[in-house]
Swiss-Prot record:
It is found in: Cell membrane. GO terms for cellular component: plasma membrane. This is Uncharacterized lipoprotein YajI. It comes from the Bacteria. The keyword Ligase does not apply. A lipid is attached at residue 20 (S-diacylglycerol cysteine). Keywords: Cell membrane, Lipoprotein, Membrane, Palmitate, Signal. It comes from Escherichia coli (strain K12). It is a lipid-anchor. A lipid is attached at residue 20 (N-palmitoyl cysteine). Residues 1-19 form the signal peptide.
Amino acid sequence: MNTNVFRLLLLGSLFSLSACVQQSEVRQMKHSVSTLNQEMTQLNQETVKITQQNRLNAKSSSGVYLLPGAKTPARLESQIGTLRMSLVNITPDADGTTLTLRIQGESNDPLPAFSGTVEYGQIQGTIDNFQEINVQNQLINAPASVLAPSDVDIPLQLKGISVDQLGFVRIHDIQPVMQ
């Protein structure tokens, strides 16, 4: 009888342990699915922004559009050659938004000193029928590069617009500067 009770307790313990293991695995699976859903949502949002950025640039006759949510570079044919531009380190500050405009030359030559114009603001409407609102601009200047291929990081402070409000950054009129 003692043996039967012991076997019964052992069998009950095994069922309890297997139920705990299954609950742990279920919790782990739910966490994995939740993480995957968040990542898919983020990828979908980035895909929409990349598509919007590509459409804006296809329609643009002057300059290149960069959308903060796209997290992907865009190319600009300029007077100093083909440039690859992107926005990095986008953060809020007391006066608006700070970010870095990364400009990369695509040739094997160093970039000359250059200037250009940066416009930024909000986009209202659809990509096919949009309006830029609250547009502000600032001039940028970059020194000549010594190395090739060249990367130039230009810190920008975009006053009066929060990270959430920032709909676009457009760079245009890139011209060499004589030193």
